[in-house]
């Protein structure tokens, strides 16, 4: 009664197989991309940092360890992408996750947009089907560290929302959508309009009572899977391994038949129970293959058909004899129902485990194994190490040998040509696997072990152009052409980057140029204005202002102008100017000199002073006797003119006396004497001696003429007047030169201790273009009160006794009389004493004056 299925499938059934489903992993939940030959990893890649990419049109996804408990504290994610314009439908087949009120402990989410949750489920109730609105979805599974359950198992299918035609193993919904045939009448609305469940209600209506007929004692009632009506079957069909009832009533609660064996040969074959008939529900078989050789074992499934209803049936293949999840090579399910399937081990041992649920059954599988390099007795070697093929595979248009030996030299084709199929169409070797179909059925591009030059060999034995590799498009169908691609920047990006860098560089140069220009303008503006000195610079450059003339007099550093001593009224101005000239040369007074003439000698400075007509002062030494000298009294002009003339006279005393008489006569109203000739003195000594002698004579005679008083004249010594005058002049000149030499020597050693006048001279800046030096010294009004006999003092010491009124003349013979003030550098210490002279310095001064001025007392 049971219907037997043919061992060979028709071409129509083969072409109508379910669209290359992706196999789910039993125990580990690992997934792999589906193609004609699918390799599934033993360890899931979904439970990691990145989601597992799935591109197959359909498949099964299970939680890690299903149907056993899933691990604690895991996070798994899957990303399913369909073709553009398609939608994805998910149908849950088993679901058992720890439940909570808001599903915040263990949960499963489905998202159309990343990180935007649209579906969350937990608990033990199977969720309703999920239909996406986009061509991609994210599936995420999370578990905490508490309770673990069995997990979930779901199937997905992708297709367009409306198809004109569906495959023979698919069901067309009322809205035009196609779903797998197995989803019909499963109490799940995968169509979206419940059209896949409406027809089931009509078919499930039990027949009327009249349709039932009583069965004999050795029979049982069964809803035939073939006629779909209740019938009576003999008891012998129960638990025979063959399903006769639609509801599997004849094979439920039966003992599982013993299956599986230990295979120890280099080659062999095995199959599922009752093959090619349906295997019994609940079958659990294991085959251990141990060839005793270290070489690889090649396992081929020539026929494979499993049931996918309920929990699903599966076949697991392990590398080795132990059931080690880490050595899992492949998991085959109902979605791998195509042949041939090939699995290669890494050693000479393989473990094959087959498990079926008790819900439904299918035809099963047929498999062969052999050591790498050996062929089965009924196979023909391909040559070398290229494998084997059978006689049925000869000239069938499909390459079973990598070198094409099973398809070469066929009767319908010429030499070195290969048939497209058994219809007589052939093609040359150069057209094989070049990604260009020359056969109507495309057999020249199938099962390509090698590709023509310029093509890339995909993992699913397809060939694509090399230029299509790493172009961000899946051309192989399994994504192998986009794996391990280097990060190559497109030419457009490089061009844009170069142009952008050039523009940025140009802008940078312009910015730098503008910055430099602004900086130069800023610095130019800063140089155009005077900036204030910093505090440190101001402290370094700050100099103390020199004291005023009044402060110097008040402090006693310099004497008043009235204190300069003179021998006669006519001689006062000349002697004062001469003393100041010598003092300025020695550094004791402030005289402003031009820069070019400061290195001149002392005598050029003395005789090069010009008279200033605007200052009211006297020139130092004038060679012009007729020059008018301003004064406060007109009676003093003849005396001063006479003094000027006598400074330049080098004649005898008689000549001087005669000249004095002329001057006196002219002064008293007589006839004016002729002007004397301008004879310049030969030396400064003669000028100095002449000035002293003339001043003495003028003072004596002027006293008789003006005052009318009798003055006792001093008798000259026995020596001749000329010799006495020369001796006195030489003595005074010697003393002056000795004073100058001493002062010059002391000035170099006490340069750091200069007088205030010298400091004043250094601190005052004058005009560099002044050629003349003026010495503004007022003329004393008390010249008539001076003692005419006080001309015996040294030349450089004449102003020491000048005071506010009449002062006692200095007498060298009376050392008890101490002058109150003394100008000029001290002979002992080299310092100018403008106030009281110390006793130590006074003793040395008195001693020198006593010894040096004895010859000068003749005046």
Curated annotation (Swiss-Prot):
Q: What Pfam families does the annotation carry? A: CUB, Ldl_recept_a
- What is the gene name? LRP12
Entry's transmembrane regions: 493-513
Against PANTHER family, the record matches this protein to: LOW-DENSITY LIPOPROTEIN RECEPTOR-RELATED, LOW-DENSITY LIPOPROTEIN RECEPTOR-RELATED PROTEIN 12
Organism of provenance: Pongo abelii
Record-given protein name: Low-density lipoprotein receptor-related protein 12
Signal peptide coordinates:
1-32
Query: What quaternary structure, including any partners, is listed in this protein's UniProt entry?
Result: May interact with RACK1, ZFYVE9 and NMRK2.
Q: Which UniProt keywords apply?
A: Coated pit, Disulfide bond, Endocytosis, Glycoprotein, Membrane, Receptor, Repeat, Signal, Transmembrane, Transmembrane helix
User: Where does the protein principally reside?
Assistant: membrane
> Domain CUB, which positions?
47-159, 259-372
Q: How does it sit in the membrane?
A: Single-pass type I membrane protein
**GO terms for biological process, alphabetical:** cell adhesion; endocytosis; integrin activation; lymphocyte migration into lymphoid organs; neuron migration; neuron projection development
Which of this chain's residues carry glycans?
Answer: 75, 146, 284, 366, 409, 441
Region entry Disordered: which residue ranges?
623-678, 693-723, 748-770, 802-823
Note the InterPro entries from the entry: CUB_dom, LDL_receptor-like_sf, LDLR, LDLR_class-A_CS, LDrepeatLR_classA_rpt, Sperma_CUB_dom_sf
Q: Where is the composition biased (Polar residues)?
A: 748-757, 802-814
What is this protein for, i.e. what is its function? Answer: Probable receptor, which may be involved in the internalization of lipophilic molecules and/or signal transduction. May act as a tumor suppressor.
**Which molecular function terms from Gene Ontology are attached?**
integrin binding
S-S bonds = 47-76, 103-122, 166-178, 173-191, 185-200, 215-232, 222-245, 239-254, 259-285, 375-388, 382-401, 395-410, 413-426, 420-439, 433-448, 451-463, 458-476, 470-485
Q: PROSITE patterns, per this entry?
A: CUB, LDLRA_1, LDLRA_2
């Amino acid at each position: 009664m049971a219907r037997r299925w043919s061992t060979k499938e028709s071409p129509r059934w083969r072409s109508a197989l379910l669209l290359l489903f992706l196999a789910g992993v039993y125990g580990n939940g690992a997934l792999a991309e589906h193609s004609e030959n699918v390799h599934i990893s033993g360890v899931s890649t979904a439970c990691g940092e990145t989601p597992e990419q799935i591109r197959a049109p359909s498949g099964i996804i299970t939680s890690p360890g299903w149907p056993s408990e899933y691990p604690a504290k895991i996070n798994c994610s899957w990303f399913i992408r369909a073709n553009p314009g398609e939608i994805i439908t998910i149908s849950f087949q088993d679901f058992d996750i720890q439940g909570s009120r808001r599903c915040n402990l263990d949960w499963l989410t489905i998202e159309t947009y990343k990180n935007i949750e649209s579906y969350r489920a937990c608990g033990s109730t199977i969720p309703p089907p999920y239909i996406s609105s986009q061509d991609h979805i994210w599936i995420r599974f999370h578990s905490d560290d508490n309770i673990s359950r069995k997990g979930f198992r779901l199937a997905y299918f992708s297709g367009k929302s409306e198809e004109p035609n569906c495959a023979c193993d698919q069901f067309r919904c009322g809205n035009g959508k196609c779903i797998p045939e197995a989803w019909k009448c499963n109490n799940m609305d995968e169509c979206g309009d419940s059209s896949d469940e409406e027809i089931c209600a009509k078919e499930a209506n039990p027949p009327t009572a009249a349709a039932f007929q009583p069965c004999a004692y050795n029979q049982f009632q069964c809803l035939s899977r073939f006629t779909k009506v209740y019938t009576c079957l003999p008891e012998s069909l129960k638990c025979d391994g063959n399903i006769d009832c639609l509801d599997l009533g004849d094979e439920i609660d039966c003992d599982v038949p013993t299956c599986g064996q230990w295979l120890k040969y280099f080659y062999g074959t095995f199959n599922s129970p009752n093959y090619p008939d349906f295997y019994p529900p609940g079958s659990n078989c294991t085959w251990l293959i141990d060839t005793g050789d270290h070489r690889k074992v090649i396992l081929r499934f020539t026929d494979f058909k499993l049931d996918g209803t309920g929990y699903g049936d599966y076949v697991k293949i392990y590398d080795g004899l132990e059931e080690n999840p880490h050595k899992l090579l492949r998991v085959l399910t109902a979605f791998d129902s195509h042949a041939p399937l090939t699995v290669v081990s890494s050693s000479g041992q393989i473990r094959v485990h087959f498990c079926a649920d008790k819900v439904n059954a299918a035809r099963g599988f047929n498999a062969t194994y052999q050591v790498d390099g050996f062929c089965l007795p009924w196979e023909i070697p391909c040559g070398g190490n290229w494998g084997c093929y059978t006689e049925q595979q000869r000239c069938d248009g499909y390459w079973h040998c990598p070198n094409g030996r099973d398809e070469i030299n066929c009767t319908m084709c010429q030499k070195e040509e290969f048939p497209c199929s058994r219809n007589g169409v052939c093609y040359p070797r150069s057209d094989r696997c070049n990604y260009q179909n020359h056969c109507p059925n495309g057999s020249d591009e199938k099962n390509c072990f090698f590709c023509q030059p310029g093509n890339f060999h995909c993992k699913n034995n397809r060939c694509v152009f090399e230029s299509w590799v790493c172009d961000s498009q899946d051309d192989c169908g399994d994504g192998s052409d986009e794996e391990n691609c280097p990060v190559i920047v497109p030419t457009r990006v490089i061009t844009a980057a170069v142009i952008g860098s050039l523009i940025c560089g140009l802008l940078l140069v312009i910015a730098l140029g503008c910055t430099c220009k602004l900086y130069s303008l800023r610095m130019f503006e800063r140089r155009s204005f005077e900036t204030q000195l910093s505090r440190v610079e101001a402290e370094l450059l700050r100099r103390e202002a020199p004291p005023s003339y009044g402060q110097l007099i008040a402090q006693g550093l310099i004497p008043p102008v009235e204190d300069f001593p003179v021998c006669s009224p006519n001689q006062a101005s000349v002697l004062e100017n001469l003393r100041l000239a010598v003092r300025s040369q020695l550094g004791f007074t402030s005289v402003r000199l031009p820069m070019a003439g400061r290195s001149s000698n002392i005598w050029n400075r003395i005789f090069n002073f010009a008279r200033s007509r605007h200052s009211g002062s006297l020139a130092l030494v004038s060679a012009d006797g007729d020059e008018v000298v301003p004064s406060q009294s007109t009676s003093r002009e003849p005396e001063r003119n006479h003094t000027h003339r006598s400074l330049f006279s080098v004649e005898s005393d008689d000549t001087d006396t005669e000249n004095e008489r002329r001057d006196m006569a002219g002064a008293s109203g007589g006839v004016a004497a002729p002007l004397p000739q301008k004879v310049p003195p030969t030396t400064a000594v003669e000028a100095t001696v002449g000035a002293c002698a003339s001043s003495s004579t003028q003072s004596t005679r002027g006293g008789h003429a003006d005052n009318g008083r009798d003055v006792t004249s001093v008798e000259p010594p026995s020596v001749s007047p000329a010799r006495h005058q020369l001796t006195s002049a030489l003595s005074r000149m010697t003393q002056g030169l000795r004073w100058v030499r001493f002062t010059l020597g002391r000035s170099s050693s006490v340069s750091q201790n200069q007088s205030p006048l010298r400091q004043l001279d250094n601190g005052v800046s004058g005009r560099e273009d002044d050629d003349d030096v003026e010495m503004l010294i007022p003329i004393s009004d008390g010249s008539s009160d001076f003692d005419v006999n006080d001309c015996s003092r040294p030349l450089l010491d004449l102003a020491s006794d000048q005071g506010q009124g009449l002062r006692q003349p200095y007498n060298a013979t009376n050392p008890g009389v101490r002058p109150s003030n003394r100008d000029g550098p001290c002979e002992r210490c080299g310092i100018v004493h403008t106030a009281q002279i110390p006793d130590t310095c006074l003793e040395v001064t008195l001693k020198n004056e006593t010894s040096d001025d004895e010859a000068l007392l003749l005046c």
